[in-house]
């Protein structure tokens, strides 16, 4: 038994003594225990006759005991313009060849093309700072002076100096820079980042000129006579050569228009003749073109005026006769005669209908039988005579053949019925 502080620290004596140690067990190797391997061709080592098997058996064995194939990553094909995702390349190719994709692609290209001139105009409006050549010394070399970058397609870049001339005078450089800057962008300001106010009034002037052109075009494509606006010069020309425009022009000149083969005034084809009376309040209108002063009548055309001149009414007035007024008595007589004729026709039709109905419903021997019955005296006058019965019913309605019994039995006789308990 060891006591003292030496028990806490390992003793050299104990360290020198041989102590039995536990042997370490190696890890189990399943390859020595199993007859087949986990890698490579496992079915080949497990089944010796694998190569001579049926293809179906080979597929089943390789699927069951074979090494699992790595999962293939699914490819996603998408269209960023139409925001669609496809399952295969064939679907994507069919979509790219379709009309929907083509329409959207054209719309995107049109939007981009509209944005390009706007951005170019903004780039041209923004002016880059011009290098200060006056601050440099007269003896400064030319290579340190940078050339101004081009400011867009409509602006011309400043002329670059010839590389052969290396030492031009400083005044020539200043003149060239000032001329190039004035020719390229005259309203530019030397401060960087500030836009020139020149393009805005120019755009306003262009807009006003375009609106003025549009108004003038609308004015050119308008017919003030017919109050019609058309869309093109060809339509205006066709309208001017049309019948409606010609009628409106003739109406303005006072000439009669023609409607379905007969001349009609501008007031319309359905207007009736109007009597000319004095204007209200002593105001008189212009003298009509077709007017009969004798009858105080205004018509719409020359043909109507000729018809009026040849009418009986005008001739009577010309001869000094008073016009015959249309009396109410004559109209009543006409209506009464018409009503009488209608009533007569109705009565004749009713008589004819009664005759035809009586002839259809009553047989021909009935009147003779009735006269024979009425001729018999005594209380038996209403008894029908045998001749009348024979004439009314020449043959029996229900003959004896209808009630004749059949030759054989209608139903065969059945045997006796025996009732017995079970």
Curated annotation (Swiss-Prot):
Gene Ontology cellular-component terms listed: nucleus
Alphabetical list of SUPFAM superfamilies matching this protein: beta-beta-alpha zinc fingers
Composition bias type Basic and acidic residues, residue spans: 164-173
Zinc finger regions, Matrin-type: 77-107, 225-259, 290-320
Entry keywords, A to Z: Metal-binding, Nucleus, Repeat, Zinc, Zinc-finger
Subcellular location: Nucleus
Record-linked Pfam families: zf-met
Region: Disordered, residue numbers: 107-218, 249-287, 303-333
Biased composition, class Pro residues, residue ranges: 147-162
A GO molecular function held by the record: zinc ion binding
Domain of life: Eukaryota
Compositional bias (Basic residues): 255-277
Matches recorded under PANTHER family: DOUBLE-STRANDED RNA-BINDING ZINC FINGER PROTEIN, ZINC FINGER PROTEIN 385C
Protein's recorded name: Zinc finger protein 385C
Protein's organism: Homo sapiens (Human)
